[in-house]
UniProtKB/Swiss-Prot annotation:
Described purpose of this protein according to its UniProt entry: Probable gustatory receptor which mediates acceptance or avoidance behavior, depending on its substrates. Seems to be involved in the sensing of bitter taste since it is expressed in neurons that mediate sensitivity to bitter compounds.
Pfam families for this protein: 7tm_7
Membrane-topology descriptor: Multi-pass membrane protein
Entry's family note: Belongs to the insect chemoreceptor superfamily. Gustatory receptor (GR) family. Gr22e subfamily.
Originating gene: Gr22b
Keyword Nucleotide-binding recorded: no
Protein name: Putative gustatory receptor 22b
Length: 386
């Protein structure tokens, strides 16, 4: 699945995926056990793990809320200097807590759908693409590693901000619970991220096989092309799997995007208040741009993974057009290629959330621009206090 174990990137990706799996089991956000009795390993939904995950994560959230109210008496100097910053920080905190409550409820409510998706991925991996697992997909490994690094970077950035902010008297339990909640939410998003990347990897493998088939037909027109029917069937299943994945995670991903973009606003506003209003010049200010860059990197990885899958589907249509340039074409080959091309033109890999917007690079860029426009509006609104 990950290529040669001697290569560092496939090895790192494999270890990071294992860590994600064990961490998800530990926090109860992947409530499935492995049923190894069947020829192809399948996942079985565990009621105990489902209940354990719901109770554990809700307990952590409500404990975090209680501790936050207990230790809210001490106010940061930045909040005294700028009440708008305090208001924004409270609103972002409420958004994050509500997002956590909804995400964990959706994880519980939609666990059956997620189980079906995972079992379909296992069938594709160990049955349909079994002979192609030796082919290394560089983008898959790269994106998995980067996503895990951003999760680690966010946790380190959160710790840095809590230690670096002047006048902040933090409670270690509050910080640890906040990190645990953030880690749990990131693992939920990681499941979607890996699902998208696996679909991309399978489309990429189909494209590579189609390219090989084109090369063989150019050299030998009598080459067996019956595999096109198999690729067409797999492509249909991947399109359906993509649709199910988007439906299962559309609310979680929408909340994730809202939380990420709104978090970027408050980080920049903190930097403006400390740097311009309070004229506090110290090394700790580096923590704010560092946190901002990690958040944008994490946000863009999710956008780029979806965009990569869309482009892989578009590339399939381009490869199929090459078949029309072949000489000595067979009628059956032409019929198979036309059917495949029709499917590619009428059904595409799209990641539209809640029917509102698509996740691709163009829309991701618009979201980032919109975030900074909101920031400009806040600066204009609160200009006299800055």
């Amino acid at each position: 699945m990950f290529g040669s174990s001697r290569e560092i990137r496939p090895y790192l990706a494999r270890q990071m995926l294992k860590t994600t799996l064990y961490g998800s089991w530990l926090l109860g956000i992947f409530p499935f056990t492995l049923d190894s009795g069947k020829r192809i390993r399948q996942l079985r939904r565990s009621r105990c793990l489902t209940l354990y995950g719901l109770v554990l994560n809700y307990f952590l959230i409500f404990t975090l809320i209680r501790l936050a109210f207990e230790y809210r008496k001490h106010k940061l100097e930045a909040f005294k200097r700028n009440p708008v910053l305090e208001m924004i920080n409270v609103v972002i905190g409420i958004i994050n807590v509500l997002s956590a409550l909804i995400v964990h409820f959706m994880n519980f409510w939609g666990s059956r759908k997620v189980g079906e998706i995972c079992n379909e991925l296992l069938i594709l991996e160990y049955q349909d693409f079994e002979g192609l697992n030796g082919r290394n997909c560089p983008n898959f490994n790269c994106f998995v590693i980067q996503k895990c690094l951003t999760i680690l970077g966010q946790l380190l950035s959160f710790f840095t901000l809590n230690f670096a902010l002047p006048g902040l008297e933090f409670h270690i339990c509050l910080v640890l619970l906040s990190c645990l909640m953030e880690f749990s939410l990131n693992l939920n998003i990681m499941h979607y991220h890996v699902g998208v990347l696996l679909i991309y990897r399978y489309v990429w493998l189909i494209n590579e096989q189609l390219k090989d088939l084109v090369s063989q037909l150019k050299l030998n027109p009598e080459t067996d092309f019956s595999r096109i029917h198999q690729f067409l069937s797999l492509y249909k299943r991947l399109l359906e799997l993509n649709r199910k994945l988007v439906i299962a995670y559309e609310y979680q991903m929408t909340l994730f995007i809202i939380a990420q973009l709104s978090g970027n606003i408050v980080v920049i506003y903190f930097l403006i208040v400390y740097g311009l209003s309070m004229r506090t010049y110290s090394i700790f200010l580096v923590a704010f741009p560092n946190s901002l860059l990690i958040n944008i990197w994490d946000f863009w990885l999710c956008i780029a993974a979806c965009d990569l899958t869309e482009k892989a589907g578009d590339e399939t249509a381009i490869i199929l057009k090459i078949f029309s340039d072949l000489e000595h074409r067979d009628d059956k080959l032409e019929m198979s290629v036309n059917e495949f091309a029709w499917l590619c033109s009428h059904r595409k890999f799209r990641f539209q959330l809640c029917g509102l917007f698509s996740m691709n690079c163009r829309m991701g860029f618009k979201m980032i621009i919109t975030t900074f426009l909101y920031l400009v509006y806040l600066v204009q609104f609160d200009y006299m206090n800055l």
